[in-house]
């Protein structure tokens, strides 16, 4: 399995391979690289899709130190550099979008486009931080995981039980404490609203109409704050991971966007 060492982390990724233009994707909190299985199937082999496991998720390993989304962005660039790729389109869902934005800020000339699903440039409010801390503390704690896992599946994934089952199986059989440092990273995400105007590449933004993580105004504010051309789409009936439950619609939007980039 492919791994790259990056500042105390052994970062796992999946690479569809090929010589097509590269698209680097980061998953939402609690998820892993398999969140993008549908997109890899739809985009490859015309595009080279690279899906990265963030620290605290999937097969990526890391030391016990704290980290930020800037560190995750550097992890992602380490993967890109390891693969010998110069220019990429970067994207992600939720926290994966946080990472993508910071990738674009770290290396602007190397990013040809952004694909952001359920994402914002703002820090969380005090109310949001308290709410997320309650959820992650319950997840990491010693109480029954099944109840909280089913609640998280309903909120993040939405859809129906068939969409939930593969992820519930992963969560209930895994190490529930692995997300502790990742939870701190998420809850303490910094506000980059005053920086995103420097991102001038084209951007595709998508929000599930029932996404509990970010409301319409938050994503609209991000769309308008970016320094380049940006389009914002809402997927009716979708929650935080529309690429999972409404894959055909997301795949089509991504293919159209990538086509307009000439990639």
Question: What label would you give each PLM region?
Answer:
Residues 202-238:
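Conserved loop-alpha-helix segment in the C-terminal half of the alpha/beta-hydrolase fold
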Residues 92, 96, 100:
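Gly/Ala-rich beta-loop-alpha elbow adjacent to hydrolase catalytic centers
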Residues 37-41, 50-91, 252-255:
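Active-site loop/oxyanion-hole signature of alpha/beta-hydrolase fold enzymes
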Residues 101-106, 111-141:
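Flexible "cap/lid" loop of the alpha/beta hydrolase fold
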Residues 1-23, 45-47, 85, 231, ...:
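Alpha/beta-hydrolase fold catalytic core
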Residues 125-130, 142-197:
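Conserved alpha/beta-hydrolase catalytic His-Asp/Glu region
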Residues 7-65:
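Conserved HGGG/HGGXW glycine-rich cap/lid loop of the alpha/beta-hydrolase fold
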Residues 238-251:
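Catalytic histidine-centered segment of alpha/beta-hydrolase-like enzymes
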């Amino acid at each position: 399995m492919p791994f790259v060492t990056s500042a105390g982390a052994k970062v796992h990724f999946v690479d569809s391979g090929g010589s097509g233009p590269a698209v680097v994707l980061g998953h939402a909190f609690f998820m892993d690289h398999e969140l993008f299985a549908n997109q890899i199937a739809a985009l490859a082999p015309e595009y080279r899709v690279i899906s990265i496991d963030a620290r605290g998720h999937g097969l990526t390993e890391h030391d016990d130190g704290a980290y930020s989304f800037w560190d995750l962005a550097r992890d992602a660039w380490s993967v890109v550099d390891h693969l010998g790729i110069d220019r990429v389109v970067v994207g992600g869902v939720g926290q994966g979008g946080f990472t993508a934005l910071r990738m674009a800020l770290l290396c602007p000339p190397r990013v040809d486009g952004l694909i952001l699903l359920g994402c914002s440039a703002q820090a969380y409010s005090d109310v949001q931080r308290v709410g997320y801390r309650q959820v992650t503390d319950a997840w990491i704690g010693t109480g029954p995981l099944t109840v909280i896992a089913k609640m998280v599946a309903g909120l993040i994934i939405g859809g129906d039980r068939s969409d939930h089952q593969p992820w519930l199986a992963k969560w209930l059989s895994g190490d529930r404490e692995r997300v502790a440092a990742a939870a701190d990273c998420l809850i303490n995400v910094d506000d980059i609203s005053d920086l995103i105007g420097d991102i001038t590449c084209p951007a595709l933004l998508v929000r599930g109409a029932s996404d509990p993580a970010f409301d319409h105004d938050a994503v609209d504010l991000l769309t308008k704050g970016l320094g380049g051309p940006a389009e914002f789409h809402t997927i009716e009936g979708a929650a935080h991971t529309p690429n999972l439950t409404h894959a055909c619609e997301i795949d089509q939007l991504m293919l159209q966007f990538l086509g307009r980039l000439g990639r």
